Amino acid sequence: MEQKFYICKHCGNIIAKVKDTGVPVICCGEPMSEIIPGTTDASVEKHVPVWTVENGVVHVKFGSVEHPMLPEHYIEWVSLHTKQGNQRKELHPGEKPEVCFALCEGDEVEAVYAYCNLHSLWKA
């Protein structure tokens, strides 16, 4: 199943759906909205994750220009979707906008998602 993320338009809760049985996801008494990830980025700050695999480690950065990591504008989290499952890492203002994930032998990257607090979800 392709990874899907949903956001509540009232409180801002974000969830990742693990299994889809067709029942709407509800928060604050209303259905949550699916977040459709961007895949190309024409803005000055690059958001699309760029990943490489070296010796079983997935290295993730964001575009050709380093993304700001300020309290008002930063990458909140990164999610790695592989053939065997998912991993997620949180980032905080002031940190370098890079993460690494361990990849088990035989596993393969299917997608990498990054969530910017201002510009929403991005996918590579």
Show which residues each predicted segment covers.
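Short cysteine-rich clusters marking metal-coordination/redox-active sites
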Residues: 8-11, 27, 116
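Cysteine-rich micro-motifs
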Residues: 21-32
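Short amphipathic, basic-aromatic surface patches that mediate peripheral association
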Residues: 62-70
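Flanking scaffold residues of small Cys/His-coordinated metal-binding clusters
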Residues: 3, 19-22
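Short acidic/polar inter-strand loop motif in beta-rich domains
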Residues: 117-124
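Cys/His-rich microdomains that often coordinate metals
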Residues: 15, 31-32, 120
